[in-house]
C-alpha cells in the first residue's frame, strides 16, 4: 500500500527540482532590479509602452469622472416653483414657520401658554 503513495511524491519532487534548476539558470538580477533603462527599448516597444500608459491614464480619468457623476446625481435638486399649487404649498410652509416665530416672539408671556392649551369649552348643545 505504501508503494502507491511513493511514485506521485517522487514525480512531484523531480518536477520541483527541475523547476528550481531552471530558475537558477535565469538571471534573478534583471527581474528584481528596480532600475529601468528606457535606452534599451527599441522604437516599437517604446510606442507600445506609451500607448499602455495613455490607456491606463484614460481609464483612471474615466473611473474618476463616473464616480463624480454618481455622487453628483444622487443630490436632490429642487425644481422651479411656477405652478399655483406649488406656490400655495410654499406660502403655507412659510406661514407655518413664521407663525411659530410670531407666537414665540410677539405674544405676551402671560397669555401664550394658557390661552392655547386651556380647557376647551364646547358651545354646541
Swiss-Prot record:
SMART domains: CALCITONIN (SM00113). Residues 26-77 form a propeptide. GO terms for molecular function: calcitonin receptor binding; hormone activity. Disulfide bonds join 81-86. Belongs to the calcitonin family. GO terms for cellular component: extracellular space. Stimulates cAMP production via the calcitonin receptor (CT) but not via the CT-like (CL) receptor. This is Calcitonin receptor-stimulating peptide 1. Keywords: Cleavage on pair of basic residues, Disulfide bond, Receptor, Secreted, Signal. It comes from Ovis aries (Sheep). It is found in: Secreted. Pfam families: Calc_CGRP_IAPP. Residues 1-25 form the signal peptide. GO terms for biological process: adenylate cyclase-activating G protein-coupled receptor signaling pathway; regulation of cytosolic calcium ion concentration.
